[in-house]
């Protein structure tokens, strides 16, 4: 392990103590507040003489399995493209998600399912917690390779709280419709991470630039993450929608949007690529934007054609972002976006929110019939017009951007505290800083890691 004895000693204690404290505090809060809901508690369920076939587990758990695989396998492997950071990409994804799902159960529980002095949990709580963990992992992608595990846990601690508040404001106070989380998950997670990355800007990061690229096998592993995410994204968007036509429509719209974004990505990648060749970075990421861009509108009457058009647009915009905007983001705005979350989640999330504004504004009783109540209950009840709902959708986007920006700024200041362990500029994107790597002794003998140096946050 590289570094001075003092840093090594601090690293040895910092992560264990923080993990023990967070897990202990979470366990105490669970003991005091968390209880099974009526669909999970043995006595309450059987007291009502329900048939086991009616339990929500049988309707929701298949979607939960897909979402869970996306969070732990999809996100984890999507970030293993860095040639010397695979352990950290998968391992820290595992760590962050495991903590975030516990902490978000509490935060979301206090906001959404707190009654009788307790938080009541079931399979929907598990899905919501995974959604929140997904937002945290999106933010992680923006600072991948430049932060230590203790910093990341503190980032999650703050972000989960702000995620829960933002979600509560949008869904419960503003009545925004966002079935697949274009705003609450993707836009929030992306811009929280981007602002965080800006605050943590490292002017001397060039010292580790040689590790920031991929190699052949790391790109292949990343494609595993891409395919997992691509396959399961219809379940992600439909996981918590109303059973029946709404859930069916959500999966269908996402399915077609993903297909179109993939073709758009291949087309643009070849068009802007050197000698007309495809860029694996584009394929790994931009092909997924079809799932992001229809997140808000997937439950609405978007139409299959609308889903195709939205997906194709998202794929092309994201590919152009990776090719042209990412370098500008770093050189002009000093945002070092390791995974390009602005192109995969940020821009497509904003486009998805704007698409939701458009589709909500076109909602009519004739188009939705009796299904209007499940998609736009306030319009069905006569409390809002379609135009008013569209304006609330637009305001929800601005609220999300505000929470994400302020939260990312606060998170950056928190993570810059001098006692928190982070890799020096010359050791970013390097597994050996935090992991025992097979063959590391031979590697050090040939090319030793640099001695300890100070971080250079701007």
Curated annotation (Swiss-Prot):
<keyword id="KW-0813">Transport</keyword>
<feature type="topological domain" description="Cytoplasmic">
    <location>
        <begin position="202"/>
        <end position="219"/>
    </location>
</feature>
<comment type="function">
    <text>Ammonium transporter involved in the maintenance of acid-base homeostasis. Transports ammonium and its related derivative methylammonium across the basolateral plasma membrane of epithelial cells likely contributing to renal transepithelial ammonia transport and ammonia metabolism. May transport either NH4(+) or NH3 ammonia species predominantly mediating an electrogenic NH4(+) transport. May act as a CO2 channel providing for renal acid secretion.</text>
</comment>
<protein>
    <recommendedName>
        <fullName>Ammonium transporter Rh type B</fullName>
    </recommendedName>
</protein>
<dbReference type="InterPro" id="IPR029020">
    <property type="entry name" value="Ammonium/urea_transptr"/>
</dbReference>
<feature type="topological domain" description="Extracellular">
    <location>
        <begin position="241"/>
        <end position="251"/>
    </location>
</feature>
<feature type="topological domain" description="Cytoplasmic">
    <location>
        <begin position="326"/>
        <end position="346"/>
    </location>
</feature>
<feature type="transmembrane region" description="Helical">
    <location>
        <begin position="150"/>
        <end position="170"/>
    </location>
</feature>
<comment type="subunit">
    <text>Interacts (via C-terminus) with ANK2 and ANK3; required for targeting to the basolateral membrane.</text>
</comment>
<feature type="topological domain" description="Cytoplasmic">
    <location>
        <begin position="273"/>
        <end position="282"/>
    </location>
</feature>
<feature type="transmembrane region" description="Helical">
    <location>
        <begin position="220"/>
        <end position="240"/>
    </location>
</feature>
<dbReference type="Pfam" id="PF00909">
    <property type="entry name" value="Ammonium_transp"/>
</dbReference>
<dbReference type="GO" id="GO:0072488">
    <property type="term" value="P:ammonium transmembrane transport"/>
</dbReference>
<feature type="transmembrane region" description="Helical">
    <location>
        <begin position="283"/>
        <end position="303"/>
    </location>
</feature>
<feature type="topological domain" description="Extracellular">
    <location>
        <begin position="171"/>
        <end position="178"/>
    </location>
</feature>
<feature type="glycosylation site" description="N-linked (GlcNAc...) asparagine">
    <location>
        <position position="49"/>
    </location>
</feature>
<dbReference type="GO" id="GO:0097272">
    <property type="term" value="P:ammonium homeostasis"/>
</dbReference>
<keyword id="KW-0325">Glycoprotein</keyword>
<dbReference type="InterPro" id="IPR024041">
    <property type="entry name" value="NH4_transpt_AmtB-like_dom"/>
</dbReference>
<keyword id="KW-0472">Membrane</keyword>
<feature type="transmembrane region" description="Helical">
    <location>
        <begin position="347"/>
        <end position="367"/>
    </location>
</feature>
<dbReference type="GO" id="GO:0014731">
    <property type="term" value="C:spectrin-associated cytoskeleton"/>
</dbReference>
<keyword id="KW-1003">Cell membrane</keyword>
<feature type="topological domain" description="Cytoplasmic">
    <location>
        <begin position="146"/>
        <end position="149"/>
    </location>
</feature>
<feature type="transmembrane region" description="Helical">
    <location>
        <begin position="125"/>
        <end position="145"/>
    </location>
</feature>
<feature type="transmembrane region" description="Helical">
    <location>
        <begin position="14"/>
        <end position="34"/>
    </location>
</feature>
<keyword id="KW-1133">Transmembrane helix</keyword>
<feature type="region of interest" description="Interaction with ANK3">
    <location>
        <begin position="416"/>
        <end position="424"/>
    </location>
</feature>
<feature type="topological domain" description="Extracellular">
    <location>
        <begin position="35"/>
        <end position="61"/>
    </location>
</feature>
<feature type="transmembrane region" description="Helical">
    <location>
        <begin position="62"/>
        <end position="82"/>
    </location>
</feature>
<feature type="topological domain" description="Extracellular">
    <location>
        <begin position="368"/>
        <end position="393"/>
    </location>
</feature>
<feature type="transmembrane region" description="Helical">
    <location>
        <begin position="394"/>
        <end position="414"/>
    </location>
</feature>
<feature type="topological domain" description="Cytoplasmic">
    <location>
        <begin position="415"/>
        <end position="458"/>
    </location>
</feature>
<comment type="similarity">
    <text>Belongs to the ammonium transporter (TC 2.A.49) family. Rh subfamily.</text>
</comment>
<dbReference type="GO" id="GO:0035379">
    <property type="term" value="F:carbon dioxide transmembrane transporter activity"/>
</dbReference>
<feature type="topological domain" description="Extracellular">
    <location>
        <position position="304"/>
    </location>
</feature>
<dbReference type="GO" id="GO:0070634">
    <property type="term" value="P:transepithelial ammonium transport"/>
</dbReference>
<dbReference type="GO" id="GO:0008519">
    <property type="term" value="F:ammonium channel activity"/>
</dbReference>
<feature type="topological domain" description="Cytoplasmic">
    <location>
        <begin position="83"/>
        <end position="86"/>
    </location>
</feature>
<feature type="short sequence motif" description="Basolateral sorting signal">
    <location>
        <begin position="429"/>
        <end position="432"/>
    </location>
</feature>
<feature type="transmembrane region" description="Helical">
    <location>
        <begin position="87"/>
        <end position="107"/>
    </location>
</feature>
<feature type="topological domain" description="Extracellular">
    <location>
        <begin position="108"/>
        <end position="124"/>
    </location>
</feature>
